[in-house]
Amino acid sequence: PTGLCTGSSGLLLTAVVCGDAIGWESGGREHIARQCTNGVIAAATHARDTNLDDINVDAINGLASQLRAYAEIAEYLPEVRPNLRELARVTRRVTRKWLRNYPESPDDAGYAHSTAGVLDAYLAASHLCGATVDTVLVEQQVQAILAAIHATGNVSQGWCHGMAGFGFLAAHLCDHIDTRAAGESLLSAIRPGLLAPVDHLGLSV
């Protein structure tokens, strides 16, 4: 496994953050940097050479999760950045194609395995490689998410399928002027449920 939550990219991210916080053993930083660079190259190659139907795109352990892990790693290890740009280009192409081919009103539009997480990866990849964001596609996907929220009627506050995940996407949409309106419309829809007082947030559901 190579994903963020149960795979090598998540372990590498943990090693990098810990190494930066408590200090590296002799040669440790260079060793981890090589592993990270190899991981970025492998992720880009796999996504480039594999049919869309055979690619796990999701934000838990798929391509979207790897992009997020290695983008964070690159903040600590600048030597990873040159290859990260290629991973971003490939991720942008794959996520854009996935979004265009996904049903317009999925039953689950959540962050972990569906539209919200893939759209967030598309945004991140576009900005990382300096490409223009397809604002029409973004608006279509946000409308699909809103339709799924309204159709469900009782969306959890959790991260994987619920309000917390949608809020994470909305915050990133609002970071950029060309997608801010879409982010604000999503925030407006989830605000009452996201901020309602509860005994248990259930971040994993």
Q: Which residue stretches match the model-derived regions?
A:
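Glycine-centered tight-turn and secondary-structure capping sites
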Residues: L4-G10, A59-G62, A112-G117, C160-G165, ...
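Long, well-ordered core segments of solenoidal/helical folds
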Residues: P1, E30-L52, R85-S105, T132-G153, ...
